[in-house]
Every structure is written in C-alpha cells, then in structure tokens.
Amino acid sequence: MPNRGVVLLDGQALAYDIEKDLKNKIQTITAQTHKRPKLAVILVGKDPASITYVNMKIKACQRVGMDFDLKTLQEDITEAKLLSLIKDYNTDQNISGVLVQLPLPRHIDSKMVLEAIDPSKDVDGFHPLNIGKLCTQKESFLPATPMGVMRLLKHYHIEIKGKDVAIIGASNIIGKPLSMLMLNAGASVSVCHILTKDISFYTQNADIVCVGVGKPDLIKASMLKKGAVVVDIGINHLNDGRIVGDVDFNNAQKVAGFITPVPKGVGPMTIVSLLENTLIAFEKQQRKGF
C-alpha cells in the first residue's frame, strides 16, 4: 500500500482513458474512410520477454480497433532478409507504422535495421532522423517510453520547467531521448550511467528522478530528496515471480511526493504512446494520399 502522503502516478488508469479516446477516433476514421491504422510488428527469435511485450502491444491494438501484422521470424534469419521485409513494409500503403522488437540477435546490426525503417513509419521514434528532429525541437515521432513519461507527468500537473532532473540510464531508447524532452521542457538535466561515480550525488538534489536500467532496488529512499517525483521505468522479473522496478518502492514512497508503481506505471503509457504514434502516422499518410 502507498504511503498516505505520496501520490501514485497511475499510468494504467491514464492509458485506459487514452485508449478510449483512440478507439473513438479510429471508429470515426473507419466510418469516414473505410480504412484503419495498421501496425506491422517484427519479432525475431523466441526471447520470452520480447514475446510478452509483443503480445501486450497486439492486445492493445485489438482493444482500440487498430489492425496489425505480426511477423515472427527465426532467430537465425539473415540481416539481408530482415532488411528486405522492412523495405516491403515501407512501401506497403496498408501499413501505417513499422516496429522491430528489440533486442535483436547478435549477428544483426540493430542500428542498421532501425535506420532501414521509413522515418514516416518509425512509430518507435528510433530513426536517426526522428531523434535529430527531437534534439532540434522539430515535429517528429517521439520514442514511446519517454513520450509516455512526459504525458504522465503532464497529466498530474507536475512542473518541469526550472526543475532539476536526474536520469539514471543513458540508453538510446530511454535515457537520451528522455533527457532531450526534459531539456526542451526547461529542466536542468543530469544523466547518470555505468561510469557515474556517485549516483546519489545527483539524485539527492533532484526534483525529479527517472530511472530505467534494469537493476532492482538501485534507487534507495536515502538517495531521494523529500517530496521528489520518482519515475521508475525499470522492469525486472524476480525468481519468486514478482515484477519490480529499479526503485526500492516500499521505502522510497515514504520519502517521495509522487512515484510510479511497477507494474501499472510507465509500462502502460509506453504501449499507448506507440498506438498514438501509429494513428498520427496513419493520418499523415492519408493527408499525403499514401
């Protein structure tokens, strides 16, 4: 149970409301155009976590009435064949967005694969062109998890402008794009990573702490400022079957002013942000007569 003084940032509830809005929009579009958005999902191999995440995305598509095309490929598929499939999706007028589930097998160059996706269908927001637009504050597809985090903070009227933000994790998927979004919103941002000597130096002085590195209980209550906003992006599957984040939730929530639970925090916002990007891609393609 959460501490009485802390506010839980309920991503599941917000995502549910956004899904209802998306469903209504798609129904209206379908009635008017006899077309609907379609997300292509590529899964390579049989990684259990990847299969789980893909299934969650497919179920979300079904809930809002969005079509999908799932391609499950053998782990030993050649890079050339994967790139050829992406090229086919790029030119397929029935496909609104293309998503390649990460991570990919070691013999495949992930950067090359992500760069092969048409930027106008890059609903994961990982293409260098879209990342570049993010950095220069031009309209682009935002990576789903950072997009979901910002949407969640906005929903709870959490001020970012002028605040000190500590981001733990510098990945291309979460940490780097989230730092740019925070910077664009007027925050002073510190990004910590594996070579950071003393993470607590940054977290103890931060108004907002965001962490997503995949290490249970990395962030302790003693590392937080009283009343801090704590965004836990980590997802860790423990041997006892529990799913936890990167924050010691039970103790951290006694110090924090706002905190995301795991699960039901950032995860649902990531998926619904992907759906939003796919709808945006569809609408842009329709305006261009694609």
Curated annotation (Swiss-Prot):
One of its GO terms (molecular function) is methenyltetrahydrofolate cyclohydrolase activity. PROSITE patterns: THF_DHG_CYH_1, THF_DHG_CYH_2. Pfam families: THF_DHG_CYH, THF_DHG_CYH_C. Keywords: Amino-acid biosynthesis, Histidine biosynthesis, Hydrolase, Methionine biosynthesis, Multifunctional enzyme, NADP, One-carbon metabolism, Oxidoreductase, Purine biosynthesis. It comes from the Bacteria. NCBIfam families: PRK10792.1, PRK14191.1. Belongs to the tetrahydrofolate dehydrogenase/cyclohydrolase family. This is Bifunctional protein FolD. It comes from Helicobacter pylori (strain HPAG1).
